[in-house]
Amino acid sequence: MNKREIARYIDQTNLKPYATKEDIIKLCDEAIEYGFYAVCVNPYRVKLAKDYLREKNADVKVASVIGFPLGATPTEVKVFEAKRALEDGADELDMVINIGALKDKDYEYVKNDIAEVVKVAHERGAKVKVIIETCYLTEEEKVKACELAKEAGADFVKTSTGFGTGGATVEDVRLMRKVVGPEMGVKAAGGIRTYEQALEMIEAGANRIGTSSGVKIVEGAPDE
């Protein structure tokens, strides 16, 4: 997989709480230069990223995060956050599942929590990725989380926030792909810093990579 091809898998990410305006502009410039699929930024920075990319006439989507990084806010709060991010120009929303509710086996709540965000996103033509935060889940819970995300109409399942105790693993990506089937997206995120790691995730079934190391990944890829 060459530089140009792997770049289209990448959501170049800066979710640091202390990211400045300058940092976000740099992120957008990298996305333009390397041809990344999207930039992923905190909700407060969506408008800045969208306006800048639009001004540059760039073919780069803007993703943002909802209920991040804990997933423990009430559904109404996630919906409000989603609406605001969409108004500011987000094309994709990476929302965190309610992990505690999943562990309580309150599956109706978990599914509805996702479905409500999906509803507002799809009304505006935006996609939703559901972060299941694999590092906190048993195998059984990972399977259930993927099933609920699929039933709720989400577009992707995603491994990790990058703020938990662990990131993406090849095993988790493979399992998630097996559960959701070919028609849904799988995003691997958390700890992916090299071309080799990214390629492993893609071979395991990921069709999106979330990373703050997109430049390093592309530079490690063959030219052709």
From Swiss-Prot:
Catalytic activity: 2-deoxy-D-ribose 5-phosphate = D-glyceraldehyde 3-phosphate + acetaldehyde
Active site (UniProt): D94, K158, K187
Record function comment: Catalyzes a reversible aldol reaction between acetaldehyde and D-glyceraldehyde 3-phosphate to generate 2-deoxy-D-ribose 5-phosphate. Could be involved in pentose biosynthesis.
Entries under HAMAP family matching the protein: DeoC_type1 (MF_00114)
Biological processes, Gene Ontology terms: 2-deoxyribose 1-phosphate catabolic process; carbohydrate catabolic process; deoxyribonucleotide catabolic process
CDD domains: DeoC
Annotated NCBIfam families: deoC
Influence of temperature on activity: Optimum temperature is 95 degrees Celsius.
A Pfam family that the UniProt record links to this protein: DeoC
GO CC field: cytoplasm
Listed EC numbers: 4.1.2.4
pH-activity relationship: Optimum pH is 4.0.
Top class in the EC scheme: lyase
UniProt entry keywords in alphabetical sequence: Cytoplasm, Lyase, Schiff base
Regions that span the bilayer: none
InterPro entries: Aldolase_TIM, DeoC, DeoC/FbaB/LacD_aldolase, DeoC_typeI
Protein's recorded name: Deoxyribose-phosphate aldolase
Subcellular location(s) of the protein: Cytoplasm
